[in-house]
Amino acid sequence: MELRRGGVGSQARARRMDGDSRDGGGGCKDAGSEDYENLPTSASLSTHMTAGAMAGILEHSVMYPVDSVKTRMQSLNPDPKAHYTSVYGALKKIIRTEGFWRPLRGLNVMMMGAGPAHAMYFACYENMKRTLNAVFHHQGNSHLANGICKRLSGVRKVSPSTDPSPGFSSL
């Protein structure tokens, strides 16, 4: 929140960051908190898809080495010489014995799938959220609408494009 002063003798008045001069009531929620998690309402479909694709690629590329170590630790026939005490210890041992790039093997294929999948999921979620929020709760955000959107967009993402019935049978 920023304070602006008028001329001499005028009272200082609070002005919200978004330009609205309404009194915020002095609550604990500051004016910029909504902007942190939401894209602008004028954001296009391509903006939502780009944001989703970048988030998915980043998430998978960061967690892929940990997932590959976890999969190796859970495998039914692990290497008898492998004595892993923790995920970090296993990652260190794999890098030392098999090379630096071993935990990243297959990451390129994962990223090629994660980008389009997360782009579609994010775009579906944001579009349905905007539509259902208008139906359920005219002022602001509806938790019910967001939950419904989350569930339906997740089902839609993993279902084949031609036949929606297998994905919706799990509802």
Swiss-Prot record:
Name of the protein described by the UniProt record: Mitoferrin-1
- Membrane topology qualifier: Multi-pass membrane protein
A GO BP term here is: positive regulation of hemoglobin biosynthetic process
A GO MF annotation of the entry reads:
ferrous iron transmembrane transporter activity
As for subcellular location, the record says: Mitochondrion inner membrane
Solcar repeats: which residues? 43-131
Q: Which gene encodes it?
A: SLC25A37
Q: What is its main location?
A: mitochondrion
Instruction: Give the InterPro entries listed for this entry.
Output: Mitochondrial_sb/sol_carrier, Mt_carrier_dom_sf
| Recorded GO CC terms | mitochondrial inner membrane; mitochondrial membrane; mitochondrion
Keyword terms:
Ion transport, Iron, Iron transport, Membrane, Mitochondrion, Mitochondrion inner membrane, Transmembrane, Transmembrane helix, Transport
Family according to the record: Belongs to the mitochondrial carrier (TC 2.A.29) family.
Reaction catalysis annotation: Fe(2+)(in) = Fe(2+)(out)
Q: Does the keyword Transmembrane helix apply?
A: yes
Q: Which residues cross the membrane?
A: 45-64, 105-125, 143-163
What role does this protein play? Mitochondrial iron transporter that specifically mediates iron uptake in developing erythroid cells, thereby playing an essential role in heme biosynthesis.
Q: Which Pfam families does this entry report, sorted A to Z? A: Mito_carr (PF00153)
Q: How does it assemble?
A: Interacts with ACB10; this interaction stabilizes SLC25A37 and enhances the function of SLC25A37 to import mitochondrial iron during erythroid differentiation.
The record's region (Disordered) falls at 1-40
